[in-house]
Amino acid sequence: MAKAASKGKADGPDPIVQAAFALAARLRWRHVTLADIADEAKVSLAELYHAYPSKDAILAAYTSAVDEMVLAGAEPPDEEESVKDRLFDALMRRFDAMKPQRDGIAAILRDGAEGPVSMLCGAARLLRSMAWTLESVGVSASGPAGAIKTKGLLAVYLGTLRVWLRDDTEDLSRTMAALDKRLARAEQFASTLFGGRRRATPPPEQPPVEPAPPA
């Protein structure tokens, strides 16, 4: 049997992860077993266990693979381009990267992954993904302010995700329109989301203090 492929490659999810999402699209995710995934991927259970000891580990690997594809396509931030436009490009790279597995993603979301624990783990993974997205466009995701920006971007992403799941256009034009609208709204009402890294600047020079006139 084929050996399990390495995880987290920038060129996309490995065959085991792809097999899991293909099964999710055909069956209910909660009904897909690890044995089913091994059979679909043409690997032994031992090889599957070595690569991914649980279905949640497969979902985590998928998120990481998508993150790597998004970051691999990132370019150094252009100061002439607005943060809104940079975020638009980064999130559209994410939707483009996920398109081959869209049916599987929809099925997994309908089933709520494997219950509350998996859903909470998924939320943590998405927050990490959004933090990396912010960093890739030149916006710091560190500290309390970074946490607010990360959660704000996650809200934009999840709102657009609902449109993307139903978008049957070849160029994802509905998704692009929805994303642009949500980012524009965020830009209008939550300027902290679009606050990039500020260059360190010296404090303004103080005017010289004139000696007080004699009394």
Predicted regions and their residues:
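Amphipathic alpha-helical interaction segments
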Residues: 15, 36, 86-89, 93, ...
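Short, basic, alpha-helical segments at the C-terminal edge of helix-turn-helix-like DNA-binding modules
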Residues: 64-70
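C-terminal peripheral helix-coil segments that are non-catalytic and often amphipathic
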Residues: 2, 135, 166-215
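Short amphipathic alpha-helical elements of helix-turn-helix/winged-helix folds
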Residues: 19-23, 97
